[in-house]
Amino acid sequence: MGDRVAGKVALVTGAARGQGWADALRLAQEGADLIVIDVCAPLPSVVYDSATPEDLAETVRQIQKTGRRVISGMADVRDLDTLRGLVDDAARRLGRLDVVVANAGICVPKAWDQVTPKIFDDTISTNVTGTWKRLRQQRN
């Protein structure tokens, strides 16, 4: 393993399962402390099971096994105020924030002509707007 993130603090959104979980665990294995965020609730237009609080707790347990510090929180990336509060508090507690992995996203598997305006808006607001808001807020 490399040491490119050793001693750094990383934020991973969408960290309870899938790619976000894998990213968070790998960062911890490479020596980063983590802030892990996931909505852990059903989302509009999403037909598959969303991550749960138990999934996020398991992510935390796996990171703790690496010996790294971890702070978790539940937030929707579209809710900038809540996300900002969680991340700012966690970054204060961990000393800083060096890396952002804006991974949260949804997928609504439908043919293009079956995608309603609501489904489209939910997908764009989560996958694009939520990510943009998070990164923009971090810059400021």
Where are these regions (language model features)?
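Rossmann-fold cofactor-recognition segment
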Residues: R61-D79
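The beta1-alpha1 cofactor-binding region of Rossmann-like NAD(H)/NADP(H)-dependent oxidoreductases
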Residues: P53-A57, M74-L86, P117
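A short, exposed helix-loop element centered on a Lys and neighboring polar residues
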Residues: L135-R136
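A glycine-rich helix->loop->beta "capping" turn
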Residues: T66-R69, D89-V100, V108, I119
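Conserved glycine-rich Rossmann-like NAD(P)H-binding loop of the short-chain dehydrogenase/reductase
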Residues: A32-E58
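Canonical Rossmann dinucleotide-binding motif of NAD(H)/NADP(H)-dependent dehydrogenases/reductases
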Residues: G2-A41
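Substrate-binding pocket helix/loop in short-chain dehydrogenase/reductase
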Residues: I63, A111-W112, T116-I124
